[in-house]
Amino acid sequence: MNISMSYRFALWAIAIALASCAAGLQAATDSPAVQAAEALQPKAKPPFVIPTDAAARGKLVAEVREYMQRAPAEVRAHPAAADFPGVLAPNTPRVTRTVTVSGDRKRWQSTGLYANAGEVVTVTPATALPAGVSIEIIIGCHTDSLLGDKQTEWKRFPLLSRKFTLGPAATPVANAFGGPIFAAVRGNTGKAGFSLDLRLANAAEAPFFVLGKTTPAQWAAIRNAPAPWGELVGHNMILHFPASQVRQMDDPTPLLEWWDKVVAAEDHLVGWPERTEQERVVPDRQISAGWMHSGYPFMCYLASAPMITDLKKLRTDGDWGFFHELGHNHQSPAWTFAGQTEVTVNFFSLYCMETVCGKPTGTGHGAIKDLDALLKKRFADPPEMGPFEQLGPFIVLIRKFGWAPLQATLASYQSAPAAPKSSVEERQAEFIRRYSKNAKADLSAFFKLMGYACPDSLRGELKSLPAFDFAAWRAQMGTAKP
């Protein structure tokens, strides 16, 4: 080793020692909560097993919450951020960009930018906000909290997303885990729309495609952007994926158009007007409940991400589970009664399987393949009341009368909502009334067989309509009596 190399090596060793010393001093001044949170580094394998002792668990939860509330200037990258959701590669360029926020939207508005773990991004509004209106800056799309009592282990840090209220001037924001950056308008209900430019400094570009706006040339340039997560924005649906998956897509247009069609079909079934804001799907290493769950964002596991993009399979087979969870975002208590949350939601799966994927009416899931068996169980004494057994009678109505009466019935609640504070019995009777009138048939006896409240007054009101003869229908369909 020559002198020059020895000198450089010595300088490097000194720098490492100084950095280690500084890190040690910083760690020594951290609160016990911060030290405990940074020592918590769960992975997919092995996961972190949550203490079963209530006091120990409560202490850990409090430490995690405190850690994720640190002021931006105090935030540094968590040691587990590189494992999930990922960090920027060394020497990744940072950019300053201006994005426009629309004041008449309530949900997240995408920026196409990414905050690296532990780094401060400065957000500056171009002008003052209208009175009573605020803007929330969100860093991180993985919003599921894993701090709930039902969790027994963590495969990633239990909180990953942070929110900040934008100030009148430059506002620093930071997240120990980084993430895509979003803006959300708060408090503008009933006020006129507006637009506001936001300047974001020290962010990184993400693979970001907007249907109808991003050109092939632009996509070729941005698909390899350095952020670890990418985003595909449709008219009705926004899809988040690990960037490695997004970069494989030569043209996201057909995929987004297909998902837009799915959301539009579900909107149509309940009579929603043309939407101005999208649903949003985020795959995660670990979610708070189930294999997927509804909400905003709609959450699923990373294992489901390839299914979301397999357009060939989606076009032919659909995806009952995705249709189902999106359906939860469309359900209403006006026509979903106790024990039916996992029943009426499958109207949407059935509808998409038929209208989007071309499946025969009342098919698309193995559990409903044998309708006769379902009906025998549903109308047995005592009845089986599983979600598919309860779905069976609705499949009967759809096969008999088509989708139009059910669609008209669900849509009618948009223009004529159920009476406020009405009882379950009153709401059930109202549903029977609307469905019967739209089907142009008296369905009261059939719904009474299903256990719905059906007062004599309603039966008298519907007696001018031809009665639906369920027994005759079953005989005609070649099914046996229960």
What are these regions (language model features)?
Residues 219-220, 225-400, 408-409:
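Catalytic cores of extracellular degradative/oxidative enzymes
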Residues 371-459, 467-470:
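Active-site-proximal alpha-helical
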Residues 66-204:
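Beta-strand-enriched, solvent-exposed domains that form extended recognition/catalytic surfaces
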Residues 28-76, 235-241:
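Activation corresponds to long, low-complexity, non-globular regions
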Residues 28-36, 54, 66-67, 71-74, ...:
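Beta/coil-rich, acidic/histidine-enriched accessory regions frequently appended to metallopeptidases
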Residues 2-12:
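Bacterial N-terminal signal peptides that target proteins for export
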Residues 187-232:
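Exposed low-complexity, polar/acidic, P/S/T/G-rich flexible segments that act as propeptides
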Residues 10-20:
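Bacterial N-terminal signal peptides
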